[in-house]
């Protein structure tokens, strides 16, 4: 199995939040704003996704600045893209909007406490939150996410894998890249 000959790219939904007044005001009034659809710039994300999918190239990388509530575009041309990875809190929802089955959905199941440690560390370091706020925001977003996505809420796709601690990753990789 050789994946080094394949060129891939990762689109993180974390880099596609809305900007401007919406993202500055609404978080003050809407609990868990950044974990809800209203915060996600789905139009821009879909535009980038479709361009990469159709053309096999990417022109720039996008980065969301949580303190300034802006998206920075950095020129970074990538050619001959043969696979595209979508990751982030809106990935599952986005996969439900795809019109074809030309994708593989991987969901990594983690324990709530393990996930919270990782997210709190990220939020303190990258999003300028204090630890208590990051913990409270995580608990709210965990509830929002699991309310929204009951088991099997993803549309039926034979290429859906749920990865847990005891999952045989080699089997999944063989199916993905052979």
Please tell me what each predicted stretch does.
Residues 1-3:
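Short, small-residue-biased leader/transition segments that mark boundaries at the very start
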Residues 6-23:
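Short beta-strand-centered segment that lines the nucleotide-binding/catalytic pocket of NTP-utilizing
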Residues 8-10, 103-107, 160-163:
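Conserved beta-strand scaffold positions in the cores of enzyme catalytic domains, especially
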Residues 18, 23-68:
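Conserved nucleotide-sensing/catalytic segment adjacent to the nucleotide-binding pocket
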Residues 20-21, 115-120, 172-174:
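Short, charged, surface-exposed secondary-structure boundary motifs
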Residues 71-128:
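ATP-dependent NMP and nucleoside kinases share a basic, alpha-helical "lid"
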Residues 79-81, 121-124, 143-178:
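NTP-dependent small-molecule kinase module
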Residues 134-137, 141:
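An accessory alpha-helical subdomain
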